[in-house]
């Protein structure tokens, strides 16, 4: 991609414009490695992006991203904007510099050309700014004049572009631009990290499928730049990948890979782009029951609770019994026998939200991979028993953090390189439960309501541009069409607003901040109630997520 001259006139230079690849149905997971587990093949957050903003600028940037992503799905937390401790002087990029990272959204044109133009007008307003317009000389020429425009939020952040989809699904595509000489090496590098082969591969472009359902595809792609162009790493944005068997992966990487915490490692690709690797499973020795009670008692004395209790779940207590279980209460079928007493003690003690720790305004300060409580061969939340919505619910709870696991934790701030202790823990990475999905009760509803949710969301495009802070979705995390099929799922009503700057610091000694999370009622007799049910006055803690 050339900001001035375009792709040099080659026939395949428009491959990233969406004309060739936007609507083709090449993104099924049939090309993934046979070694991939079901959990890996169906993880929509396998790739995510951290954006580092200057102090006081995170909220408008986060809202701008959420508003744009709402056109694909109202609850698609693939990005998290955080703030660095202090403003830093930026180096002026070379003239005609090409940012190494881009995000391309493919929107279905069947909803009308005006809808795409309306979103394009939104990207022309602050904090968005126009970066450049790409010229395409291939055999497929875009008919919309805006379909080759690229925008950016702030210096050092990814490029953003909108493309019409002629047929097929809507797509969120992460694109990394590679040096001409490093393209082959970069392809092998990301193939190693993603543990899958590209579904479409050309001499200068390839696409890795990340997640696919009936309506949305999430993709990761590489684009080879001409010889006279060099990509510039986005110093205020970092790609994060979930990986398995980090110990086996590290020796195979081309550049040094150093741990920044127990759960995350930092490395670079061949072009100097900073990469975070999050260990999918952190096998950690379980604390003794006495230690759990002691830690819980200590936090009850140190954390003043509001007038209404806040039910929460530890990674273990959030596990639910299979759908066909005859017992009304939760059963920890995935727990080792020796740990039943421990989790019974946790359930009897006053629970604390697993995200109620102190935060700072810096980035990457929290190990996010909790211990896997289910079998590594077949995770409980993706077992063959139970409805898809139930399995997705257990998948969601399987990645919650326990505050007990953070005692003495340290992590390196990727932005500053400083070591940070557990008293300065910051942004939770992509896989802790966000506030809008933190309701502890799932509500299965008739399948026709779930099947109409997606159509209702699309019909909303007839109105003004959706604002994620005001969107009321009719689905919980587990019941979204993003995780389930149209035929059956559970659904709940949830609502959340973007966190205000004052909520970026949550201390153990301050009252817990509630988020609006309406209660829901159990409607399916086959679904056992979870360990804690939200009462009329119960509120949940605001969560930071990507």
Swiss-Prot record:
| Bias (Polar residues) | 304-324, 347-361
Task: Please list where the region (Disordered) is annotated.
Answer: 1-37, 285-361, 488-546
Residue ranges annotated as coiled coil are: none
Check the record and name the Pfam families matching this protein: FAM124 (PF15067)
Q: Where is the composition biased (Low complexity)?
A: 24-36, 488-511
InterPro entries listed in its UniProt record = FAM124, FAM124_dom
Basic residues bias locations: 285-302
Instruction: State the disulfide connectivity.
Output: none
Per the record, the similarity remark reads: Belongs to the FAM124 family.
Q: What is this protein called?
A: Protein FAM124A
Species the sequence originates in: Pongo abelii (Sumatran orangutan)
């Amino acid at each position: 991609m050339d900001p001035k001259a375009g792709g040099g006139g080659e026939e395949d230079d428009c491959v990233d414009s969406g004309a060739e690849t936007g609507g083709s149905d090449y993104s099924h997971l049939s090309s993934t490695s046979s070694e991939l587990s079901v959990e890996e093949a169906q993880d929509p957050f396998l790739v995510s992006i951290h954006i580092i903003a200057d102090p006081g600028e995170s909220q408008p940037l986060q809202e701008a991203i959420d508003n744009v992503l709402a056109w694909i799905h109202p609850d698609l937390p693939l990005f998290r904007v955080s703030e660095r401790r202090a403003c830093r002087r930026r180096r002026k990029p070379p003239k005609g510099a090409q940012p190494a990272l881009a995000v391309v959204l493919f929107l279905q044109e069947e909803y009308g050309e005006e809808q795409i133009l309306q979103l394009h007008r939104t990207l022309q307003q602050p904090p968005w700014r126009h970066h450049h317009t790409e010229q395409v000389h291939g055999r497929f020429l875009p008919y919309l004049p805006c379909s080759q425009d690229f925008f950016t939020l702030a210096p050092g952040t990814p490029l953003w572009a909108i493309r019409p989809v002629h047929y097929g699904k809507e797509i969120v595509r992460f694109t990394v631009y590679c040096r001409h000489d490093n393209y082959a090496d970069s392809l092998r590098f990301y193939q190693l990290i993603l543990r899958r082969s590209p579904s479409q591969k050309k001499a200068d472009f390839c696409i890795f499928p990340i997640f696919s359902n009936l309506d949305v595809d999430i993709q990761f792609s590489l684009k080879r730049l001409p010889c006279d162009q060099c990509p510039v790493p986005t110093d205020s944005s970092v790609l994060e990948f979930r990986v398995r068997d980090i110990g086996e992966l590290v020796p195979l990487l081309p550049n040094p890979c150093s741990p920044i915490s127990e759960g995350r490692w930092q490395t670079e690709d061949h072009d100097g782009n900073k990469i975070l690797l999050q260990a999918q499973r952190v096998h950690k020795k379980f604390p003794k029951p006495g230690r759990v009670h002691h830690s819980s008692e200590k936090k009850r004395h140190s954390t003043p609770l509001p007038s209404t209790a806040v039910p929460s779940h530890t990674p273990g207590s959030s596990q639910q019994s299979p759908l066909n279980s005859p017992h009304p209460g939760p059963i920890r079928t995935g727990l080792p026998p020796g740990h039943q007493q421990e989790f019974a003690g946790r359930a009897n003690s006053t629970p604390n939200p697993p995200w109620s720790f102190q935060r700072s305004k810096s980035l990457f300060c929290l190990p996010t991979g909790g211990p896997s409580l289910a079998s590594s061969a077949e995770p409980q939340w993706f077992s063959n028993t139970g409805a898809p919505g139930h399995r997705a619910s257990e998948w969601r709870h399987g990645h919650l953090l326990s505050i007990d696991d953070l005692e003495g934790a340290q992590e390196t701030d990727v932005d500053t390189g400083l070591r940070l202790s557990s008293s300065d823990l910051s942004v939770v990475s992509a896989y802790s439960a966000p506030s809008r999905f933190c309701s502890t009760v799932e509500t299965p509803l008739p399948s026709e309501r779930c099947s109409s949710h997606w159509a209702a969301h699309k019909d909303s495009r007839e109105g003004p541009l959706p604002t994620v802070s005001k969107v009321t979705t009719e689905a919980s995390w587990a019941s979204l069409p993003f995780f389930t099929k149209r035929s059956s799922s559970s659904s709940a009503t949830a609502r959340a607003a973007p966190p205000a700057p004052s909520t970026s610091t949550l201390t153990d000694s301050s009252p817990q901040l509630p988020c609006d999370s309406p209660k829901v009622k159990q409607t399916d007799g086959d679904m056992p109630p979870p360990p804690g049910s939200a009462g009329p006055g119960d509120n949940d803690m605001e969560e930071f997520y990507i």
